[in-house]
Regions:
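Intrinsically disordered, low-complexity terminal tails/loops enriched in metal-binding residues
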Residues: 21-143
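Bacterial N-terminal signal peptides that target proteins for export
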Residues: 1-11
Length: 143
């Protein structure tokens, strides 16, 4: 009987320690990892390798699904909970944001075009079309 109570006590203690460690592992996420000027909506999230990653909208959830491994690597600042699961082998591109929607991330599979001898990435086809219509307007956003 005493052994049974002791075992249950150990299980409960281990469970509570696990919760404490998990809750202290990373600061709370406040900013969308893909549209980095927007706050998260707690109803809009994806689960990446068992970790909840909040986004600002359904559009960002769809965007995340296009290249989750890459986005996990470049989004650690906005979503610190990703640090433990983000790839250590994926390297971020030099261009991180769309020149048209300058707060929105791009990835290696994003729509792209050659411009002045350089490959430029866009968050979506509409952004690429806008850039083609007036590239000088968006050149300043090419970082």
């Amino acid at each position: 009987m005493l052994k049974h109570v002791f075992t249950k006590t150990l299980i409960v203690a281990a469970f509570l320690m696990g919760i404490a460690v998990t809750s202290q592992a990373a600061p709370a996420q406040k900013i969308c990892p893909l549209m980095i000027e927007d706050e998260i909506d707690e109803e809009e999230f994806v689960v990446y390798k068992g970790i909840k990653v909040y986004t600002c909208c359904g559009t960002c959830k769809k965007l995340w699904s296009q290249n989750p491994d890459y986005y996990a690597v470049v989004s650690v600042e906005q979503a610190p909970q990703l640090k433990a699961v983000a790839s250590k082998t994926i390297k971020p591109m030099a261009q991180r944001f769309c020149p048209v929607y300058s707060d929105t991330r791009v990835h290696p599979k994003s729509p792209s075009m050659e411009y002045k001898g350089k490959k430029i990435y866009f968050s979506k086809e509409r952004a690429l079309t806008r850039f083609k219509a007036n590239p000088t307007k968006y050149e300043k956003n090419l970082k």
